[in-house]
Amino acid sequence: MKIRPLHDRVIVKRMEEERKTASGIVIPDTAAEKPDQGEIVAVGAGKKDDQGKLISLDVKVGDRVLFGKYAGQTVKVEGEELLVMREEDIMGVVEQ
């Protein structure tokens, strides 16, 4: 199954966080915080302005982005957890 986001929405795959502290203590899943970074795997066509003109998104597939801890809606596709969120929920793009 494949998801195609509509309008100004994007599909984001969360980045895996390190499950071990610097001193070697393993953090259990129940105590670990959700990662606030992810990679964009799909983008919508864009948002229409008041005149009906399509405004394209500033992010693209493959961008590594920062977002709020509780941003977006979690969906499960083929056993993989993905986030569906609006472009405005993205705080920035991580430059590499």
From Swiss-Prot:
One GO biological process term: chaperone cofactor-dependent protein refolding
Keyword Cytoplasm: yes
Domain of life: Bacteria
SMART domains: Cpn10
Principal location class: cytoplasm
Location within or outside the cell: Cytoplasm
Molecular function terms, GO-annotated: ATP binding; metal ion binding; protein folding chaperone; protein-folding chaperone binding; unfolded protein binding
Keywords: Chaperone, Cytoplasm
Pfam families registered for this protein in UniProt: Cpn10 (PF00166)
GO cellular component: cytoplasm
Subunit composition and interactions: Heptamer of 7 subunits arranged in a ring. Interacts with the chaperonin GroEL.
UniProt function note: Together with the chaperonin GroEL, plays an essential role in assisting protein folding. The GroEL-GroES system forms a nano-cage that allows encapsulation of the non-native substrate proteins and provides a physical environment optimized to promote and accelerate protein folding. GroES binds to the apical surface of the GroEL ring, thereby capping the opening of the GroEL channel.
PANTHER family reported in the protein's UniProt record: 10 KDA HEAT SHOCK PROTEIN (PTHR10772), CO-CHAPERONIN GROES (PTHR10772:SF58)
Family (UniProt): Belongs to the GroES chaperonin family.
Identification of the protein by name: Co-chaperonin GroES
Source taxonomy: Bacteria, Pseudomonadati, Pseudomonadota, Betaproteobacteria, Nitrosomonadales
Name of the gene encoding the protein in the UniProt record: groES
